[in-house]
Regions:
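A short, flexible loop at the N-terminus of ABC-type nucleotide-binding domains that lies
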Residues: 1, 10-23, 73
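Walker A (P-loop) phosphate-binding loop of ABC-type ATPase nucleotide-binding domains
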Residues: 38-42
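Helix-to-loop junction immediately C-terminal to a conserved catalytic motif
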Residues: 52
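Conserved ABC transporter NBD signature motif
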Residues: 60-68
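Conserved ABC ATPase "signature" region
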Residues: 67-68, 104, 108, 115-133
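ABC ATPase NBD coupling module
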Residues: 69-85, 114, 118
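Short coil-to-helix segment of the ABC ATPase nucleotide-binding domain corresponding to the Q-loop/switch region
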Residues: 97-105
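Conserved ABC ATPase signature
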Residues: 136-141, 145-146
Length: 147
């Protein structure tokens, strides 16, 4: 579950302050599927950066599963991120690796065993309809398939 309570995020510029988020209050239940839409500069990326703990709010509190992210220790951040699923606008795929290798690489860097990777990659690809494309390179996929 995700909760924002009176969240503000401002960025300091040379002589000014840019307000990215202003008094955001939202509750997203576990398993709820959410789209974040808005014009350029509306704060969509900032919202996600706060959830992923890439940035901290200027004011307010962000909670993930009841944990106050403004109080979490930096060493615990990677463990919390592993529990999240985010579809990025830029796909962050390694162009010289196959679809299978890209997914396996993401699992390998989180210390998942080779045996579990061999089981989980085909399963994960089947969930998104890409089991028949696991040997293809990213540039052989459509934009939606890359996401």
């Amino acid at each position: 579950m995700i909760d924002f309570e009176h969240v503000y995020k401002t960025y300091e510029t040379h002589n000014d302050e840019n307000v990215a988020l202003e008094d955001i209050n939202i509750h997203i239940d576990e398993g709820e599927f959410v789209f974040i839409l808005g014009h350029s500069g509306a704060g969509k990326s900032t919202f996600l950066k706060l959830i992923q703990m890439e940035e901290k709010p200027t004011e307010g509190k962000v909670f993930i599963n009841g944990q106050d992210l403004t109080r979490i220790k930096r060493r615990k951040v990677p463990y919390l991120r592993r529990q999240m699923g985010v579809v990025f606008q830029d796909f962050r795929l390694i162009p010289t690796m196959t679809v299978y290798e890209n997914v396996a690489f993401a699992m390998r860097v989180t210390n998942i065993s080779t045996k579990k990777i061999k089981d989980r990659v085909p399963f994960a690809l089947s969930l998104v309809g890409l089991e028949d494309k696991m040997d293809r390179l990213p540039d052989e996929l459509s934009g939606g398939e890359q996401q």
